[in-house]
Design a protein with these regions (language model features):
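Short linker/helix segments within small regulatory modules
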Residues: 57-67, 159-168
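Amphipathic alpha-helical interface elements
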Residues: 8, 20-28, 35-39, 77, ...
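Short metal-binding segments enriched for Cys and/or His
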Residues: 72-91, 99-110, 176-190
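Short acidic, glycine/proline-enriched loop segments that cap or flank alpha-helices
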Residues: 57-61, 83, 293
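Structured alpha/beta or helical-core interaction and ligand-binding surfaces enriched in interleaved
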Residues: 51-54
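Short cysteine clusters
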Residues: 45-48, 70-73, 153-156, 172
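A broadly conserved sequence feature marking short terminus-proximal activation segments
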Residues: 2-49, 86-147
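"Short basic amphipathic alpha-helical interaction patches in structured regions
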Residues: 61-62, 84-89, 239
């Protein structure tokens, strides 16, 4: 039993708890929070309540006045506000054990002063109080979700782990646009990989109900969104007057040629020549297919045939999408994202194009 607790002054405390100070207002305690087998411990957003994990060594090296970011929703607050439910329960147990002993000792002191012998005659009351020793139980452990992989922020090098789509480093805040794009493309690949791991019966049922087709369509839709978000972020970061340059152009970054034109007009390289011709052509077909499913349920129309003149589909037919075509589209989109990121990596862009007067 003695190995499960330690004595601190007049109090028995469970392992992992120590009293670090006292004053007129109360007592200050230190309660250890165990890490997992990788040396990571949990943080929980006070706003969205989702969990993430941070390497304990990296965390200890950060300043005490650190403002932590939720990796999912971007809420930022003092790091002490990110205590997890299990960590809070552990701390409350430590405080509760101390409180039980403190109250017991206060009662013992009070009754010892009040205790008097019974009078030899007449009416009277004899008061006695006997306290029982308190032996604290071990603190509850921490058994939170285990990490899948370790990430490291390219900006601050802090190592952390997430359990869902995220947009922020716990220390630096918003992730670079290219990191967000890379993660999004990785998620699309992982989703296709997950489909391939389904049981045969489940796979057949989902395929018959059109679930696979809907996922393939969603993949193309998401790829366009990834490129739009990345291109817009890169463009806005590179040009102080970006808002003026895209004013009145609608969703220009959803369109491949318009995206390329915006960058070339600003003096940057032409995306159409940064990629090989076959990759650019496949991307154009993917973008046209996505547009067709979004606006015409995948049924071929004249607009599609104009964009993809080499298509063997006829007007009125519904296009089909395969897993292989989705994987190729992801690979091509990855190449496009790398090219977009590289556009502004050069020291200085060429002189912007100026229309003839």
């Amino acid at each position: 039993m003695a190995g499960m607790w330690s004595s601190s002054g007049r109090f028995r405390l469970p392992d992992g708890v120590r009293i670090v100070g006292r004053d007129s207002d109360g007592v200050r305690m230190s309660v250890s929070m165990p890490t997992d087998e990788h040396g990571f411990f949990g943080r929980q957003c006070p706003s969205c309540s989702q969990l993430f994990r941070v390497d304990s060594d990296d965390y200890e090296a950060l300043p005490d006045d650190l403002e932590l970011w939720c990796v999912y929703c971007g809420h930022h607050d003092g790091h002490s506000e990110f205590i997890t439910d299990q960590q809070l329960a552990r701390a409350k147990r430590a405080v509760g054990d101390w409180a039980v002993q403190s109250i017991g000792r206060s009662l013992g002191d009070s009754f010892s002063r009040m205790s008097t012998p019974a009078p030899r005659s007449g009416f009277g009351i004899h008061i006695s109080y006997r306290s029982r020793p308190f032996y604290p139980q071990p603190l509850p452990g921490i058994d939170e979700e285990r990490l899948i992989r370790i990430r490291a922020c390219a900006g601050c090098a802090v190592r952390y782990a997430v359990f869902g789509e995220h947009r922020y480093c716990p220390v630096c805040g918003p992730l670079p646009a290219n990191v967000v794009a890379s993660d999004a493309l990785g998620a699309e690949t992982a989703r296709l990989d997950g489909l391939a791991q389904l049981a045969t019966d489940a796979m057949a049922t989902l395929r018959e109900q059109g679930v696979f087709t809907r996922i393939y369509v969603d993949t193309l839709e998401n790829l366009v969104g990834v490129v739009e978000t990345l291109a817009k972020a890169v463009f806005n970061a590179a040009l102080p007057d970006a808002a003026l340059k895209i004013k009145g152009k609608g969703n220009a970054f959803q369109r491949l040629n318009d995206t390329a034109d915006l960058f070339t007009a600003a003096g940057y390289s032409d995306l159409r020549t940064m990629l090989d011709a076959s990759t650019w052509q496949r991307l154009k077909e993917v973008w046209a297919t996505r547009h067709l499913f979004t606006h015409n349920d995948g049924v071929v129309d004249d607009k599609y045939l104009t964009k993809v003149p080499a298509s063997t589909a006829r007007r009125g037919q519904r296009l089909t999408i395969t897993e292989q075509s989705c994987r190729q589209a992801i690979a091509d989109t990855q190449a496009l994202c790398l090219a977009i990121t590289a556009l502004t990596a050069a020291p200085e862009p060429a002189a912007p194009l100026v229309a003839d007067q």
